[in-house]
Every structure is written in C-alpha cells, then in structure tokens.
C-alpha cells in the first residue's frame, strides 16, 4: 500500500489494454489489396488446407487474413474488406475477410448464417 506522499509524487497509472487487432487502428473494418492468396495448414490436432490471403491495408500495414466459407473468387490485386477476428488454429492470422463486400463474392448455396457470408436470399 503506497503512502499519501508516494501517491502525490507518482500517482496511479491506468492499466493500458492491448488491442487484439492493431492493424485496424481502432476502425471496425479496413480496405486492402490482396498481395498473395494461398492455403496453409492448421496447428497440431487439426488437419486441413485453410484459405488465407496476405493483404496490404490502406495504412500500408500488411496482414494475413482468413477467407471464410466454401470457395472464393479472390486473387492477387483483389480489393477486400478486412475485419478483426482471429482463427484459433492458424498462428498469426488475426483478421478475416468480409464476404460479399467489394471484390469478394458471397458464398454460393448458403442457407443458414447467410449475412456472415454475404449470401443473398435464394428465390423460390
């Protein structure tokens, strides 16, 4: 417990919380350009080929972003919208690409959780 004199001299410093998505610079989403689109393998107990893209954001920061959903149309120089949100089994992937925004198409034949994948309502 500090004395009154110590508090007068130094004061209390507030705890600084570290942001989980620093490249977004406080924005909910940021636009960027794909520099490389490739697949990578997840951490130990899981096995798959996860689709990821290297994206240069508008601030000049380059990040690795996950491409969610089944199938995608992204290639180099595609303009994408990037949001925060990590992928637990891919180390270093702390961002996701928003489906159905800018150059990214929505997932085809998606019936549930459509808004997350930019899928339009299917006509009867």
Curated annotation (Swiss-Prot):
Belongs to the universal ribosomal protein uS12 family. The lineage of its organism: Bacteria, Bacillati, Actinomycetota, Actinomycetes, Micrococcales. Residues 9-18 have a biased composition (Basic residues). This is Small ribosomal subunit protein uS12. Part of the 30S ribosomal subunit. Contacts proteins S8 and S17. May interact with IF1 in the 30S initiation complex. Residues 1-28 are annotated as: Disordered. CDD domains: Ribosomal_S12. GO terms for biological process: translation. It comes from Paenarthrobacter aurescens (strain TC1).
